[in-house]
């Protein structure tokens, strides 16, 4: 399958800018992305032993700590009061507010967190915390989809331009040698015009 960067490069180098050619480029990018993501998901399932979506959904969650017990209602309240605020900004504000609370203010939430942990141990006695790997991170050795198609495209264009310049230099040098080989030999009896013409070709 032709890569996205190769397709873009072929359109860039050609004069065919028809809608049919341009329409195929997003399809190539989606196909490459799908193949790379599918390959990574298969590898992730083999390493973790997960063979279906149900196993991911049935994963046991960690019990909430004191901060999450406190921020559960605070986050909902802040989101309602600031509907345009991003979730990351809400998390920052909640973290700052939690640090400003006194030990006495935090104590009820620590007690609630201890109760939740006790219930969790009773319900899942064999539970072991396993950090979940980020599914949106692609492996470094994935060559089906470039990390930055624009950078790859620019690299290929620069490479082609460099090769083109090298070919032009070689062709010009070969043409000059051929033309210089047919020049008459320079002697003392040559006219000034002939000497100037030979000097011009030598400088080139």
UniProtKB/Swiss-Prot annotation:
Protein's UniProt keywords contain Cell inner membrane: no
Cellular component GO terms, alphabetical: cytoplasm; nuclear speck; nucleus
Keywords: Activator, Calmodulin-binding, Cytoplasm, Differentiation, DNA-binding, Nucleus, Sexual differentiation, Transcription, Transcription regulation
Residue pairs linked by disulfide bridges in the UniProt entry: none
Superkingdom of origin: Eukaryota
GO BP terms: cell differentiation; male sex determination; sex differentiation
Role description: Transcriptional regulator that controls a genetic switch in male development. It is necessary and sufficient for initiating male sex determination by directing the development of supporting cell precursors (pre-Sertoli cells) as Sertoli rather than granulosa cells. Involved in different aspects of gene regulation including promoter activation or repression. Binds to the DNA consensus sequence 5'-[AT]AACAA[AT]-3'. SRY HMG box recognizes DNA by partial intercalation in the minor groove and promotes DNA bending. Also involved in pre-mRNA splicing.
Stated name of the protein: Sex-determining region Y protein
Organism encoding this protein: Pan paniscus (Pygmy chimpanzee)
